[in-house]
């Protein structure tokens, strides 16, 4: 392709025109006018060869004179001058000198020669530029040929490399597809081989979880029953302790009254011996009245203490069953909710695992998503277990509140006077005894008895100080 474009131009530049027809030459001459053959071109051939290599300053005078003569002859031929010296057509130096002598005799000839001789410098510069352009054109044509060849080679190389790359990629993709198919087959075989083991493992896990849940619930129920029994035993023990305190307080008060009565009787006998009978009668009458008042007051005081104590015990006995039933009902409801959540979670977990292992045979890309779903369900079960733990702690708090209910009820009473103070002390003892029994169990009974004795002595002292004052 490139040779069909640039080769005629190269041949034309080297003056090889014989292999081309007239129309091609005319076409090329129209594109490059400087390539047209002429008399002037032939006359300055030697000058141009020197100029293109070294410039106008390097022209030899003989070459310059010879070229000026030839240019003059071209002008003479162009104007149709028939008388031209014959020596001017020769290339020898001697005949050329004869030509110049003949030209010198004619002013017209000499003027033409002199003008051509002087203009050779300009002609040399002009043709030097032309030949430089010619060299540039040749260089351009060479580069064009090189680029055309390079383009063709590059195109063929790219096509070949692309085809080879496509072929290699097809082979590689085919190998990857075969490996993937083989891997899928192995995975299916492995799933079929181990499906029984996996199902057995799932069943074992579900059974283990169910057993653990049942055991945990049973432990919670046992703890609940033990705590309720402890509360009931503590209630009974408190009642017995209060009754014992009342009996001891009554006996102590009777003993104090008897001692005081004996002291008064002795004092009255001594007074009768030392004073007059009338005065003794008055004193005896006053003492008897005072003694009756004290006895009446003590009887009323004991009745009031017994009445207030019975009221407190009745209120406690009335409220405790209601609160126990309420909190036990809440506890049973919470346990029922826990059972339902555990059962629901177990059924849901079993269903999800069945779905996962059923979908494993569908496609390999669904395996990852199904496993993620299973992980989420396990997290839900863990959340349910956490909820069970929270509910258990809530039940413990409710039971602790149940223990503190008697103290809360009794604290609401506001008594005024010595009798109320004594009952308040009994209430405080009731509270401390109940709490200690809950926290320390049966080992606290001895300490409770010691506390009851201390409380009885303190109440007796308060009562005696009230009587004497």
UniProtKB/Swiss-Prot annotation:
Its main location: endoplasmic reticulum. Keywords: Endoplasmic reticulum, Glycoprotein, Karyogamy, Membrane, Nucleus, Signal, Transmembrane, Transmembrane helix. One of its GO terms (cellular component) is endoplasmic reticulum membrane. It holds the Pfam family Tht1. It is a multi-pass membrane protein. GO terms for biological process: karyogamy involved in conjugation with cellular fusion; nuclear membrane fusion involved in karyogamy. It is found in: Endoplasmic reticulum membrane; Nucleus membrane. Disulfide bonds: none annotated. Glycans are attached at residues 21, 142, 199, 269, 274, 372. Residues 467-469 are lumenal. The chain crosses the membrane at residues 421-441, 446-466. Residues 442-445 are cytoplasmic. It comes from the Eukaryota. InterPro entries: Nuclear_fusion_Kar5. Required for nuclear membrane fusion during karyogamy. Belongs to the KAR5 family. This is Nuclear fusion protein KAR5. It comes from Candida glabrata (strain ATCC 2001 / BCRC 20586 / JCM 3761 / NBRC 0622 / NRRL Y-65 / CBS 138) (Yeast).
């Amino acid at each position: 392709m490139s040779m069909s474009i640039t080769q005629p131009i190269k041949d034309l530049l080297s003056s090889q025109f014989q292999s081309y027809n007239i129309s091609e030459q005319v076409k090329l001459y129209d594109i490059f006018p400087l390539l047209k053959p002429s008399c002037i071109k032939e006359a300055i051939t030697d000058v141009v060869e020197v100029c293109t290599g070294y410039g106008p300053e390097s022209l030899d005078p003989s070459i310059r004179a010879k070229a000026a003569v030839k240019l003059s002859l071209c002008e003479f031929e162009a104007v149709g001058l028939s008388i031209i010296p014959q020596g001017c057509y020769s290339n020898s130096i001697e005949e050329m000198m004869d030509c110049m002598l003949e030209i010198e005799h004619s002013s017209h000839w000499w003027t033409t020669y002199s003008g051509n001789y002087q203009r050779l410098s300009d002609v040399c510069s002009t043709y030097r530029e032309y030949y430089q352009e010619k060299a540039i054109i040749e260089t351009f044509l060479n580069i064009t040929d090189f680029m055309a060849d390079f383009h063709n080679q590059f195109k063929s190389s790219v096509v070949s490399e692309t085809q080879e790359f496509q072929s290699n990629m097809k082979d590689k993709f085919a190998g990857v597809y075969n490996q993937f198919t083989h891997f899928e087959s192995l995975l299916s075989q492995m799933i079929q081989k181990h499906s029984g083991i996996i199902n057995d493992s799932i069943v074992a896990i579900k059974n283990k979880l169910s057993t653990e849940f049942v055991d945990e619930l049973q432990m919670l129920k046992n703890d609940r029953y033990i705590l309720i029994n402890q509360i009931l035993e503590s209630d009974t023990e408190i009642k017995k302790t209060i009754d014992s305190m009342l009996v001891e307080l009554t006996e102590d008060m009777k003993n104090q009254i008897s001692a005081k009565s004996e002291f008064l009787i002795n004092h009255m006998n001594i007074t009768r011996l030392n004073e007059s009978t009338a005065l003794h009668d008055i004193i005896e009458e006053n003492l008897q009245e005072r003694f009756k008042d004290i006895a009446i007051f003590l009887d009323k005081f004991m009745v009031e203490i017994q009445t207030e104590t019975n009221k407190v015990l009745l209120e406690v006995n009335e409220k405790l069953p209601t609160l126990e039933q309420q909190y036990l009902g809440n506890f049973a409801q919470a346990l029922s909710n826990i059972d339902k959540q555990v059962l629901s979670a177990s059924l849901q977990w079993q269903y999800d695992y069945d779905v996962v292992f059923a979908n494993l045979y569908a496609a390999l890309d669904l395996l990852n998503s199904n496993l993620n779903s299973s992980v989420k369900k396990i997290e839900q079960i863990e959340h349910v277990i956490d909820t069970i733990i929270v509910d258990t702690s809530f039940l413990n708090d409710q039971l602790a509140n149940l223990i503190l209910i008697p103290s809360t009820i009794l604290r609401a009473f506001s008594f005024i006077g010595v009798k109320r103070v004594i009952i308040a002390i009994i209430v405080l003892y009731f509270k401390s005894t109940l709490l200690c029994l809950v926290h320390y169990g049966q080992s606290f009974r001895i300490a409770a008895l010691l506390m009851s004795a201390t409380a009885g002595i303190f109440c007796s002292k308060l009562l005696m100080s009230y009587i004497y004052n």
